[in-house]
Amino acid sequence: MTIVGLVIQQHDGTILFQNVREYLSLDKAHLAAKAFKNQISSYDENFITKGSISHLTGSVVVLNMYRVYYMILNELFILAISQANDNPFEGSIYLARAKRVLWSVSKDFTTTQINKKYTEVYFALERVLFGEDGVEVLSQKISEVSPHQPPHYNTHHHTSTPSVAPSFITGGSTTPPPITIFGRLIEPNQSNSLSNSISNSNSNNNNNNNNDSININSINSNIYQTTVPLTLSNVLNSSNFNNNNNNNNNNNNNNNNSNNSLNNSNSNSNIISPSSSSGNLSSFNNNNNNEEYNNYNNNYNSLDNSYSLQFESLMRLEQSNIPEKIFTQPNTLPKIDKHIYDPPQTIKWGNPSVSHIGSSASSTRVTNRIMFTLRHPNAGKEAKEKEKEKENEFKEQQEINNMNNNNNGANGNSGGSGNVIIGSAAAGSASSKSSPSTSPLSSSYNPSSPETSENSFSATPISDSNSLKNSIDNNNNNNNNNNNNNNSGDTPETPKRKFSLSMGTFNNSKSSLSTSNSNISTPDNGASSPLASSTSGSASSAAAPPPVPLTNSAKTKMNFLNF
């Protein structure tokens, strides 16, 4: 998917919606939208108010990096951002879907009506950006579209108290209602309800101290409105049910104080509990109440421990520090070796185009494209001048050889009889050119060779001197043509060009000169023909030019495109 950003922008440059994918940041999308506005303004001042509609859709490359597909509506621009080298027709479907979303909200494409359903349009464009049709979002409820908000927690949890007193205070058999703390419902155990006999303590006892004791019967639901947190265990430990300053205690009170003191050192409670109020705690003057009070003490400890475990876990969760990087997305994503836009791996010119994932170098989008180097016409000026000098020297030497061949042919014909010619010119040219002998009188004569079939040997008497001269000239011309054909590989003629696209060099393991000269056979000087022996001595003075030596280190340009 090439579209990495959708922007809804007003004609004055105000951005209404800006949806981006992970490959494009919000800052870059903003810069691309701003550059688009500046670019179309520089094209024509009346760009928006033109009469024709051909300009209402199109694509523009901005910042030399991004291609912006645009659609001009009544008051808005719809911009789809992609990479600069993507297909220019790629973003048309995104523009059509985004236009459909805006049209379903406002038929006139006005900004005020679109802003009324800002959230629905935002999530609809988000779906359009990921390749879906976003119109169905507009028919859904907002709770189904947007992510659910977390519940609102009361941060002042130490002041929130239950509205009903728990059963271990009132002595009721009903279970206290659950308490909502940190958004969780905490329900106490069913075993926390105590018997009603605890509240039926002896309230008629005269041994009451107003300052040093607590009257359980005086505690009612009104104490839960206080804001000072104090655990009941600490209150009971502070009183200890002992009154050392009271001199009016009887024996029953002394026994009760010694046997029924509360020792709740093992309970470290963090529960919310009522504060102490001014009241009296009556002493138990009957031994029958000892068992009931012990049951009350055990049940209270179990309740205190269960609450402490639940609150400790919650407090530990509340005090834990969560790093901020969990809630924030990094500005730059980690780069991977194989990007999502990379082409598949192909092999051209002997090398893989796309590097493997394990390689250190990361691939790019143009790895499978051949990069050419443009050579200037004067790039190899010195090499060209040297080639021309060698070519001129070779042509001069070739002209000298042709003149010698013509002279040798004339001398050979003057020494024989004027009535019969048996390939005299061919024999003379063969010795000077060091080519295979085609004379039927030589020892190396092969009647099946193509050279023999090509050269016509006439044994008929010719009396006309003009005809003899014409035949000699024709044979010399044929030999000169063969000489040029054999040496055609020595002087490669390259066409004149303005410039060329070249790629790479290669080494010459064997030059064309060495291969062509190695296949040339030497003439047979020991021929039985007196005509051939007479011409060989005079032709030995004009030998073939030596080949130009080329080393293996010499390099030749491979020009495959000529202009």
Curated annotation (Swiss-Prot):
Residues 460-473, 552-563 have a biased composition (Polar residues). It comes from the Eukaryota. Residues 146-170, 192-213, 235-298, 376-395, 428-563 are annotated as: Disordered. Residues 428-459, 474-487, 507-543 have a biased composition (Low complexity). InterPro entries: Longin-like_dom_sf (IPR011012). Residues 379-395 have a biased composition (Basic and acidic residues). Component of the TSET complex, a heterohexamer composed of tstA, tstB, tstC, tstD, tstE and tstF, which may act in plasma membrane turnover. tstA, tstB, tstC and tstD are likely to be the core complex members with tstE and tstF acting as associated scaffold proteins. This is TSET complex member tstC.
